[in-house]
Amino acid sequence: MINLFLYCRSGYEKECAAEIQHRAAELEIGGFVKTNKKDGYVIFQCFQAGDANILAQKIKLDSLIFARQMFAAKELLKNLPEHDRITPIMEALSDVRNAGELRVETPDTNEAKERTAFCRKFTVPLRQKLKNAGNLLKKENSSRPIIHVCFVASGTAYVGFSFSNNSSPYPMGIPRLKMASDAPSRSTLKLDEAFIHFIPEEEQEQRLSSGMNAVDLGACPGGWTYQLVRRGMFVAAVDNGPMDEGLMETGQVKHYQADGFRFEPPRKNIYWLVCDMIEKPSRVAELIEAWAINGWFKEAMFNLKLPMKSRYQDVSTILETMATVLEENEIKNFSIKCKHLYHDRDEVTVYLSLNPTQ
């Protein structure tokens, strides 16, 4: 494969492109980016055939901030005939054998959504043909590569594969979460997705358990507090604004009407710190650093609002500075991860663990 196809949020192609160029250069793999604003995807075309396979395997998807999903792809298939789109796709996938799953997708744009129904319908005959030809196993297998067919326009598609151990479990990298009817705001979905993304499923019961103590800085009206409460935690909600009455009636929330930047927890038994404040990202990062240096939490989830320009560079600098500050303050064992999640808008979610077990 010669191309690496990366899904991203529409409008963030430039950031995704800058990131993959940087990461490919670290592996000494040459290539160039092809993308258009609002496409919802980025193509990194390698100078050498086969290098895309290396990138798809060696660059961990979870380590990329702006890519939701990626796969190694052949050259763009154009002008697929309406009477037989399957044959050219089969020919392009001839060297992919015994894959475990097929995903026929589109980028996440309003225009592309018009092709969603076609993709669902087209999946059925294509899947059967791939099974008959040996490209796809008779039964789905989560340990085998995933075949991707992405229609970027009518009759135009990129085809390829991703490695199952370095791929999003969700089509196009988008988890479908339901908005709870009693949640105070849609921001609740951001923290819900963050917990699902950053905390392995087999560890969630232990690390997101009932009875834990948490602090939510900038809590009003309680979207993030809601996710902590529904997992059985006791929450110190810090905000000068009002909190949702339903949350307060649970008895699990204590509301501190205070400035989140000046608040100090009265008890130092906090496990989770969460923060979603509309503030300069560098200032929020400095606040989290101060809490970490004081040892006021074990795990933290916080959002950084993004500037309009140089977003990738600014986020990278903030994360690098945070790591340096923690090390300079004798915090040696920590883990920082960052992702532009589906439910994030002009922001990224950062996860910080002190003394991680892995």
Curated annotation (Swiss-Prot):
What top-level branch of life does the organism fall under? Bacteria
Q: Which Pfam families would you find in this protein's record?
A: FtsJ, RlmM_FDX, RLMM_N
Residue ranges crossing the lipid bilayer per the database entry: none
Output one GO MF annotation: S-adenosylmethionine-dependent methyltransferase activity
Top enzyme category? transferase
List the GO cellular component terms: cytoplasm
- The name this protein carries in UniProt is Ribosomal RNA large subunit methyltransferase M
What organism is this sequence from? Shewanella woodyi (strain ATCC 51908 / MS32)
